[in-house]
């Protein structure tokens, strides 16, 4: 067992076995569940076959899933981090990140105009603050362009960006897995301290072989799909997790699918790790958890960790804070487009978005980004030719801890399913809060983040980062996905895009719990006969009571304001919202 750990650890570092990923597959996942006798169809558990036991033993040994019974541990390091080397200092100079407090739409507009003039990098914005990266010697120029109300309304949140960037890269590990650790019989009860893969951020050269290995070991319900190739020729790879139940109706029925994406913006590493965490939890939970087994039978889950593989590789090899993809533009020295501004619905190439040097350059036209175009083509092909109906979409970004629903391009056009979108978003926020007491705000993507109570008191400020051409709007409007969200993950600005690795597992747990709520909501009445409580990765003291009587049928009236009022009550039920059969 110890030898296997050493070999696997070396593999994760050197990745000597990288080979071409199997060519694109559009076939459905297995049409029945007969290949996997471990599937649970009752509260009891069938004894696993020899291969299942062997496979799970290997998986437990290599990548141990964090325990859902303990609070997320913060992995200590006995190594002191040295000063950033000259190469990083040369790239980031004396850059800092400032947070401006905004109080009116005039403040928002002033910051937008000043940032456009100086070509500044807006990191994040909410209804209350805006984070901007700039060089120290540009601060005075920025303040000179702002009204007096903003000249003193700012504080530095990152004083030394170069050092922060250096510290965000993986450092030498201070310990190795304990070979004498007593392995638990369940993958889902393992210790997070043994979870090699999720102890740190991983480069693409490690992620792809890891995905290939999981797909080969769990072939009964997992496949790799190649959605297309990036501008630089890398394959855009995703997991497809799903299997039709043995008692399913005709295989010609349309298969419902849910898409979870990350890495559209290259520097948002936490989104990539979180998609992988959720995928791993679904893969290893099938056949062990009734809830996960039900979700995998009812839906195909397509999880794409890196929508922007070229940009992601570039953040590891050259510029940690690169945002766009890597395709060439009219200006050779300003490559790349913002992929989340290039989707076809309400594409907007005006103002700074028409400047190739802008961080949110929208390209020369709708689907001007190579990666967004091939993913859209894949989705349309699945819908038109492979009998798939997409019913859910979660696009993971960072940072600012927000749950955003359509539309991004406009605050005046209201989505027709607004009440349902808000209702599910609030349930997701509650699941996240119960995980580790982190508060995620809920709002329309066109607005800044606004708490539920503030939203009811008056109109929210328009977000500095709202725009047309977003994946969120395209999936919701053009692909008719009824439940589409963008989740902006941790944190609220202490680290921004440079979130320390100790947050990987806690953030993964938060989104995994959110996905369970998401799937449960979409199951409708089919969720009633399952005990969901045991599958949430909550600390023991945060586990909610879920009495059956709290279920609200689809015909029952539900006042969203009641849910908003109850959202601050730590003891209220998680499932106290109306589920929807899709």
UniProtKB/Swiss-Prot annotation:
Amino-acid positions noted as binding Zn(2+) in the UniProt annotation, renumbered to this chain: 265, 268, 397
Residue intervals of the Peptidase M14 domain: 200-522
Glycosylation sites: 381, 387, 571
InterPro entries on file: Peptidase_M14 (IPR000834)
GO term, biological process aspect, one: cell wall organization
Compartments reported by the entry: Vacuole; Secreted
Region of interest called Disordered, as start-end residue ranges on this chain: 561-582
Residues the record lists as binding substrate: 265-268, 323, 340-341, 398-399
Signal peptide range: 1-20
Cofactor or coenzyme needed: Zn(2+)
Protein name per Swiss-Prot or TrEMBL: Inactive metallocarboxypeptidase ECM14
Organism annotation: Coccidioides posadasii (strain RMSCC 757 / Silveira) (Valley fever fungus)
Classification lineage: Eukaryota, Fungi, Dikarya, Ascomycota, Pezizomycotina
Name of the encoding gene: ECM14
